[in-house]
């Protein structure tokens, strides 16, 4: 496997990593209970997904 000819300096490494950003998760409102949830997932508070009860509350 190919190897780099020269070592990256700390400054170059930090400049390269400056573009690594943490993005906030995209949240949508649940149509049943109006709580915020992740899209395309079962609502953790009411258990509905696509207007159907998927998870039973015990």
Swiss-Prot record:
Molecular functions per Gene Ontology: structural constituent of ribosome
Alphabetical GO biological process terms: translation
InterPro entries recorded: Ribosomal_bL32, Ribosomal_bL32_bact, Ribosomal_zn-bd
One Pfam family recorded for the sequence: Ribosomal_L32p
Domain of life: Bacteria
GO cellular component: large ribosomal subunit
Alphabetically ordered keywords of this record: Ribonucleoprotein, Ribosomal protein
Family assignment from sequence similarity: Belongs to the bacterial ribosomal protein bL32 family.
NCBIfam families: rpmF_bact
Protein's name in the database: Large ribosomal subunit protein bL32
Species this chain originates from: Caldicellulosiruptor saccharolyticus (strain ATCC 43494 / DSM 8903 / Tp8T 6331)
